[in-house]
Design a protein with these regions (language model features):
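Arg/Lys-rich, alpha-helical DNA-contact motif
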Residues: 2-19, 25, 35, 39-40, ...
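Short coil turns linking two alpha-helices in DNA-binding domains
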Residues: 30-33
Length: 107
């Protein structure tokens, strides 16, 4: 992938554009927090050719939600589980809505 290809992907929510340091700064948290939520398998950062963690905007949104819960006093493991369940619920609701749209002849 060339530099121009990478630049064109910056609008892609799944493109791992952010280093760990930049991601931590954007979230107002520490690199240790990002490592912890990675160890809890909330997010799995991609790795650069040099082995450094890289994060996407989608992953940063997930991490921000976990940080919000931790800031409210929720243990990190529980916060990660809550975020996973919220994400699963949102996906199930989206699929359900699509199913209802397809099965409703009035739509």
């Amino acid at each position: 992938m060339t530099a121009n290809d990478s630049f064109g992907r910056l609008d892609d929510d799944d493109y791992p554009a952010y280093t760990m340091g930049r991601a931590a700064a954007m979230l107002g948290t520490t690199q240790g927090f990002l490592r912890a939520i990675g160890e809890a398998r909330l997010i799995t950062p991609l790795r650069s050719d040099g082995g450094h963690r890289r994060y996407s905007r989608y992953q940063l949104r997930i991490a921000a939600r976990a940080r919000e819960l931790v800031d409210q006093g929720t243990p990190i493991e529980a916060a990660c589980r809550i975020v996973i369940l919220e994400d699963q619920l949102e996906e199930a609701q989206r699929i359900n809505a699509e199913h209802h749209q397809r099965s409703d002849p009035a739509s």
